Amino acid sequence: MPRFGYYDAVVVGAGFAGLSAAHELVRAGLSTRVLEARPRVGGRVLTRYLADGTQLDLGGQWIGPTQLNITELVQRYGVETYPTPGEGAMIVDYGGHRLTGTPPEITELFAEIDAMARQVPVAEPWNAPRAAEWDRCTFASWIADRGCSQVAARFLDRVISGGLLAGSASETSVLETLFYIASAGGVEPLLGYAGAAQDTRIVGGAQEIANRMAADLPAGTVHLSDPVLRIEHDGSGARLVTRLGEQWASRVIIAVPPMLAGRIQYDPPLPGLREGAFQRMPAGTAMKVHAVYPEPFWRADGLSGVARSTSGVLTETVDNTPPNSPRAVLTAFAYGEEAILLRRRDPAERRRIVLAQLGELFGGRALEPDEFVEFDWLAEEWTRGCFSGHFIPGGWTSFGAALRAPVGALHWACTETAVRWNGYFDGAVESGRRAAAEVGAALSG
């Protein structure tokens, strides 16, 4: 055991990145401590239960078959999964026209986007052949240059920039958009359900995996409710000042989102490129709401519960009903400007606005849920946004090379630093394992 307060490695953050890093460090025989600001583990994953046992995932919740890192954890811990309900027709509100599939105009644009994304090297997006051009150009400008219809432009803004990046097309570059798509293998692997990113859910909620990961570490490894305020560091180690005391380590893995990592005080200050990466990677803006009903009435109407819309505040809905659940759940998402609009309303008005659109999509029964549950990740002190952070235009080519690079004794892990499935659980696990490997190599060298 290490002497009090000194470890081979301290991990800041107990989300999937931090817990994955801790497991690799412990497996390598390194003394390890995990410091978590929240009173729980899981980071941007949070599962709650209603009084009757209905499961609600308030944060991240889905896994897909090509997400091999998180799938390995599901198998390791014997966590049960179930397919996302998907029988029935999808609704696409396309400029006021009610469709049951993706319009051909959009399918063609998706193919063009996929072809461009294949030109982006996911480990080094700044080295793409047209990186400088694509990083200067916003996705909104690219859409405008396509000469597509107004409704198609609106669809791409809401479904790609909103549904994938939790922002607006005017806020993100073409390069950031293409990198994110390339990291998952294409547009459809990101947007789809069966066989894609939204394929599977976890019995007991996504937080159950994080809980089991934490419990599987040596007793006392994870220290909750103790945010790191300051890190004094040099090439040989670091002193971490927390709300409750201090710790020393030969190496530190900062496994929190860029926005939060940038709020820690560093002495000496971080290099300009590293600090610049923090400042140019704001968190996304999304609002996720759950409407709980006595039964999944939409299924009787031949609907899957999946909807995408170019109008109203809601961009997407999904049937989020767990198996054997006493009640049914429709979950809806607002992104970017629409999410900000909703946040400005009081809870009663938000409820009215959301239910009105659900009623337009699914009929009058959607207007009267038993319960209406929302969770605002922007208001969470130790999150400050969702789904994940993304570079603003110019960020990748100016600061991308610094995103994962260690700074002396400091290493970086979070889904935003992942090469594959960036923004997802899987990317978080990848990043934690990569940072732990860096620490292991540094301490054995």
Regions found by a protein language model. Name each.
Residues 54-121, 128-129:
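Dinucleotide-binding Rossmann-like beta1-alpha1 core, especially the glycine-rich loop
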Residues 13-15:
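Glycine-rich Rossmann-fold phosphate-binding loop(s) that bind the pyrophosphate
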Residues 70-91, 148-157, 297-305, 367:
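A short alpha-helix-loop-beta-strand transition element characteristic
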Residues 9, 30-32, 252, 289:
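Hydrophobic anchor at the start of a short beta-strand
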Residues 2-3, 8, 17-20, 28, ...:
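Conserved flavin/dinucleotide-binding core of flavoenzymes
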Residues 26-51:
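Glycine-rich FAD pyrophosphate-binding loop
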Residues 226-233, 239-301, 365:
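Central helical "cap/lid" subdomain
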Residues 125-227, 235-238, 248, 255, ...:
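Active-site/ligand-binding neighborhood in enzyme catalytic cores
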